[in-house]
Amino acid sequence: MQIKENKQLCLISLGCSKNLVDSEVMLGKLYNYTLTNDTKSADVILINTCGFIESAKQESIQTILNAAKDKKKGAILIASGCLSERYKDEIKELIPEVDIFTGVGDYDKIDIMIAKKQNQFSEQVFLSEHYNARIITGSSVHAYVKISEGCNQKCSFCAIPSFKGKLQSRELDSILKEAENLALKGYTDMTFIAQDSSSFLYDKGQKDGLIQLISAIDKQQALKSARILYLYPSSTTLELISTIESSPIFQNYFDMPIQHISDSMLKKMRRNSSQAHHLKLLDAMKQVKESFIRSTIIVGHPEENEGEFEELSAFLDEFRFDRLNIFAFSAEENTHAYSLEKVPKKIINARIKALNKIALKHQNNSFKALLNKPIKALVENKEGEYFYKARDLRWAPEVDGEILINDSELATPLKPGHYTIMPSAFKDNILLAKVLSPF
């Protein structure tokens, strides 16, 4: 029997879903604490930070300072994760309010650090395995599964390899065991994640690692649905797209950050790819029946000229991505682009405004295309007093949209799980739908 300590833990997980997996591992080590969202009453405040770009760093620092102001006498404030790792040599002096610092190598030792009240920074980046206990958050039917850490790409703008290291793939058997264990607990929808998912097993000399994973998950038959995030263009192939299309479990969801479409900009960004390769992959994705395509764009990278931007703008309007994230270039230390001559902020802001207008138009059309059609969806939980929260099975959690189901139209309460639903109305990035049947 697990005995709860009479102590409260407030965990704040910032940044990406990969960070969330590490946060859930820490929760697994601290299972004997009572969870709270109140930083003022918590005995331990644990902030898993993000250090990817300037805005994320500022959010992490502000969250730490707010927690330091709120924490009660005797409470322990911990800063873990990417920000701590990236600035480990100076962060202790910059933010003395923190009691314990740790980076990206010791999530599974958080209980020991708290007991000893000491910092810890291991050289090896931590990679969650099937035997690491996790407390899944946010859903009783969906879980993230991290398949690798680190990245071997050399993008001009990205600092991730400097603090996450080179590509480190999990063994396929470990991933299958984790998927099976989670499915037995009711988590039958999964999102597989990494910094560069399409390079899975490249570090072990295998170029078809992700194809192997998809085939093995299909054969295992433990899951009902899954999707993959963060495909990298240079390691994505037509065979991979075809494998996803033919899978009975993996959805026709293609999340491939292209960052730009101009050949000259792709070269400046050191993306190790070309416009022709991008177009070949994107066209193949669009040919897949009921495909959903998401991407990410960086605006204002050093030396981006007006012609290159216009080429990008015209392409985005023509291709019509279902979802598009648009970021302003962030100058990051230890990157090639850091010291290059910058595009003025005024120009960057104007370009972002223009692209956001294009992205919103096509996003709304993507939502509206689902109206009055039966779609497969995952119902996750109650949203307020009157609605259940759901999402299209092709969507990733949190980022791609929300579907609400009015409980007044139901004969009996819904259990979280897989349903066929019919969206009937759309407003403010939310679809309203009714349930047709479970599946």
Swiss-Prot record:
The protein's name in its UniProt record: Ribosomal protein uS12 methylthiotransferase RimO
Entry's localization field: Cytoplasm
Source taxon at top rank: Bacteria
Source organism of this protein record: Helicobacter pylori (strain Shi470)
Keywords: 4Fe-4S, Cytoplasm, Iron, Iron-sulfur, Metal-binding, S-adenosyl-L-methionine, Transferase
Annotated NCBIfam families: 30S ribosomal protein S12 methylthiotransferase RimO, MiaB/RimO family radical SAM methylthiotransferase
Residue ranges occupied by any Radical SAM core domain in the UniProt entry: 137-365
Entry binding sites for [4Fe-4S] cluster 1: 16, 50, 82
Cofactor note: Binds 2 [4Fe-4S] clusters. One cluster is coordinated with 3 cysteines and an exchangeable S-adenosyl-L-methionine.
Gene: rimO
